[in-house]
Amino acid sequence: MKFFTCLLLLLVVLTVVFDNVDACDRSCTGVMGHPSCATCCACFTSAGKRHADGQHSRMKVRTGAKNLLKRMPLH
């Protein structure tokens, strides 16, 4: 009986977490217009998930690649 109670509790917690991520996803790619990039990033960081803004993802990758090239010694 204790096992089933724990299992049910875990299911409830996971449902709440994933509902939060879904709400976050909808707010980033909603029909009411795309929010600012910073809002989207903050939203997905708090949900523990990568944000859905493709343009921002590319921008971050580009910046990361530039920083990596700066750190590499040129021989």
Swiss-Prot record:
Entry text on domains: The cysteine framework is XXIII (C-C-C-CC-C).
Disulfide linkage: 24-28, 37-40, 41-43
Protein name: Conotoxin Im23.5
A single cellular component GO annotation: extracellular region
Domain of life: Eukaryota
Free-text tissue specificity from the UniProt record: Expressed by the venom duct.
The organism of origin for this protein: Conus imperialis (Imperial cone)
Transferase among keywords: no
Protein localization: Secreted
Propeptide part(s) removed at maturation, as residue ranges: 24-50
Stated role: Probable neurotoxin.
One GO molecular-function entry: toxin activity
Keywords for this protein: Cleavage on pair of basic residues, Disulfide bond, Neurotoxin, Secreted, Signal, Toxin
Keyword Secreted: yes
Signal peptide: 1-23
